[in-house]
Amino acid sequence: MDPRDSETRLFRRIPLGGEVFEWGTDVAHVANQIPLRPWVDEMDEDTESVALRFKGLDTWDVAELLEALWGGQSRAVAACVAALPSLGRAVEAASRRLAAGDGRLVYAGAGASGLIVALDALELEATFDWPRTRTAILLAGGLDLSHGMGSRAEDDANSASARARDLELGPADVVLAASAGGASAFTVAIVQEARRARALTVAFTCVANSALGRVAEHVVIAATGAEVIAGSTRLGAGTAQKVLTSMFSTALMVRLGFVFDNYMVNLRPENAKGARRGVRMVASIARVDENAAAQAFAQHGDIKRAVLGLAGLSRAEVETALGDAGGNMRTALARLASRRRAEP
């Protein structure tokens, strides 16, 4: 069935460049249905190009302005489709490295790209209980943003190299580096140091054949083209990098066994909302009511242990089961079921 004929649409009607286009749910059609003319002109080649389509933008009314901005965001998301194969290869390579030992996930970048990857890094602990000791952030200018971004640091390759060496990177580590234009001297220098240390390197950029792409082992490119406001890569390029880095880390955590079905069973409940979410997950997975789930959750302290406890294991048996399964709840439950089937 042609997805464009489906009654279920990703978006019903999307205005782009003064025309209305309909998108289907199939991602291949999303990329194909983004109009290249008049949206893209002869100068619309990279993130620093000027799209003549938006000449006079400052005179447009708010509705036209928002339509243009929405079109830029939509086109950026659609540009991610072509990056999925390279993204998949990067996820597989990273999961092999990180599953084999205690390697770290190192995030590097400058400016808006650096902030995007830093945000992804900071979410890992609460969402997936990824150890803080296995996460590092190399943001140009540092993480103290109380006095602004410190944009000059983007050009400081020497500082980048020194900070990367201070981490004592090695073959067990994975370095995720982002630069919209692929030209940040800070980010390129970190990847070069990582390659020397034989760490796995994954670059996220929005330009083909960039300096960053040439030095990284895996390159994930979303060719977002010129921005609605020329050079403002916090717009379309930033959106594409947020989409792709979030997909990378999420798929990576799934591959590492931190997700059961589509539940984030490694969730660390640090507030009331997280605790309620944890109880609901336990109830759904263990197929018990929320009162029983809440009791098990309170007794065992986390989702996976509560589920295994509700399966009839003592606290000591829960620890043994999870330890033998490398923390993977699906493996632990499967082994428990197999053992019980074998019992007379």
For each predicted feature, which ranges?
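Residues at the C-terminal ends
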Residues: 99-100, 196
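Glycine-rich phosphate-binding loops that contact phosphosugars or nucleotide phosphates
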Residues: 2, 17, 105-256
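Short, positively charged patches
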Residues: 48-52, 88-92, 104
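Gly-rich Lys/Arg/Thr-decorated short loops/hinges at beta-loop-alpha junctions or inter-strand turns
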Residues: 47-48, 68-76, 136-147, 260, ...
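Cofactor-/ligand-binding subdomain signature composed of acidic, glycine-rich
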Residues: 5-79, 83
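A short, well-structured juxtamembrane/interface segment
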Residues: 82-99
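Short, amphipathic alpha-helical interaction segments embedded in low-complexity terminal/linker regions
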Residues: 252-344
